[in-house]
Regions:
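An active-site-proximal structural segment forming one wall of the substrate-binding cleft
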Residues: 1-10
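Active-site-proximal helices and loops of the catalytic beta/alpha 8
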Residues: 13-115, 150-154, 158, 165-238, ...
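A solvent-exposed, charged loop/short amphipathic helix patch at secondary-structure junctions
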Residues: 120-138, 178-184
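N-terminal/domain-start segments enriched in small and hydrophobic, helix-friendly residues
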Residues: 7, 14, 25, 121, ...
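Conserved interdomain hinge at the start of the Helicase C-terminal
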Residues: 145-147
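Substrate-gating cap/lid region and adjacent catalytic-acid/histidine neighborhood
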Residues: 142
Length: 248
């Protein structure tokens, strides 16, 4: 913190910070994590303390109330929506309020280092039942990723982005192996559909940073079931509505 001026820390698999079992309610584990955070905050008040916890929701609420941010995995729901399949595509768990949390400390993400890429899933398994809207087509895949970006970034709370997500990286996580080095695809910037996704991602992030309507102190209402999803933001400065049709 003092030497490198970092903004905070992300701690890996903190459910394992215990001598007992990893699940359930563990007061000792919570006290250990809170002691670590309190020490960090004594040097830098407000430093980000992010946990990859994967614990019981009640324990995650307790940690969130203490000031932690915690990862929330909704990748598979975003993948199914992008591919054009609605059975497992609800984004409701991407919103902290749906989990009964008081604080907007749920860090959700559309892609991560542990999950398959959406563009790859679209290319390999996307809904191709409608020839005029074949999800496996790169241009159509990128437009559908614009929708996942819209919801993935504007749902209230902090977000995590993975490298080249904004350009629709479509090489499998298992090519050639899960932890193998993946080639950078700088040429994606010259591909028109990918470049459009890049620009749209920037616009959406700018909206979130520039307008209080998309901040933590807005009234947020959402229907994120089924193919057609919508969000409504109500704030004294401006109201906003976002709608996405994930159907094919």
């Amino acid at each position: 913190i003092e030497e490198y001026h970092v903004d905070g820390f992300r701690l890996d698999f903190t459910k394992g910070f215990t001598n007992g079992i990893g699940g359930g309610w563990d007061v000792g584990r919570q006290n250990l994590l809170k002691r670590i955070a309190n020490t960090v905050w004594s040097y830098k008040p407000g430093a980000y303390m992010i946990l990859e916890h994967w614990g019981d929701n009640a324990e995650e609420i307790s940690l969130s109330n203490h000031g932690f941010m915690l990862w929330g995995n909704v990748c598979h729901e975003y993948q199914d929506a992008a591919m054009g399949f609605g059975s497992n595509s609800s984004f409701s768990q991407a919103f902290h309020g749906s989990r009964g949390w008081n604080n907007a400390g749920l860090v959700t993400y559309v892609e991560s280092h542990d999950e398959e890429r959406i563009a790859f899933k679209n290319k390999a398994y996307g809904n191709n039942s409608i020839g005029s809207h074949n999800v496996r087509n790169t241009a159509i895949s990128m437009r559908r990723m614009e929708l996942t970006t819209l919801f993935g970034h504007l749902i209230p709370g902090p977000k995590m982005m993975y490298q080249f997500q904004e350009l629709g990286y479509d090489i499998s996580i298992d090519d050639p192996c899960r932890v193998c080095e993946k080639p950078p695809k700088w040429n994606y910037y010259t591909n028109v559909p990918r470049r459009r996704l890049y620009e749209i991602t920037g616009i959406i992030n700018n909206f979130k940073a520039s307008y209080p309507s998309f901040g933590p102190y807005t009234n947020f209402y959402a229907d994120m079931q089924g193919h057609v999803k919508q969000m409504r933001f109500e704030h004294s400065t401006m109201d906003a509505v976002a709608v996405g049709n994930f159907d094919v």
